[in-house]
């Protein structure tokens, strides 16, 4: 499996607001987890171009991440800018 519990804990530890492995609810940690999953699905779709169900799942993940980024932008712009810079996302 590409997303083990150890990988999730590491993502949460490096990107969460509390900087702990149990910080799963903050928008930053969720955005980082979605970004990891999006990167994995993008690589999968480069090989399997006709996998339309995965393509649909990828679009849903991108939408969820976009909504979280919009929420973070409206509430705390400094945290939004930090996560954009940290994950190398483009607006």
From Swiss-Prot:
It comes from Cytophaga hutchinsonii (strain ATCC 33406 / DSM 1761 / CIP 103989 / NBRC 15051 / NCIMB 9469 / D465). GO terms for biological process: translation. One of the primary rRNA binding proteins, it binds directly to 16S rRNA where it helps nucleate assembly of the platform of the 30S subunit by binding and bridging several RNA helices of the 16S rRNA. The keyword Ribonucleoprotein applies. Coiled coil: none annotated. Pfam families: Ribosomal_S15. One of its GO terms (cellular component) is cytosolic small ribosomal subunit. InterPro entries: Ribosomal_uS15, Ribosomal_uS15_bac-type, uS15_NS1_RNA-bd_sf. It comes from the Bacteria. GO terms for molecular function: rRNA binding; structural constituent of ribosome. This is Small ribosomal subunit protein uS15. Part of the 30S ribosomal subunit. Forms a bridge to the 50S subunit in the 70S ribosome, contacting the 23S rRNA. Disulfide bonds: none annotated. Belongs to the universal ribosomal protein uS15 family. Keywords: Ribonucleoprotein, Ribosomal protein, RNA-binding, rRNA-binding.
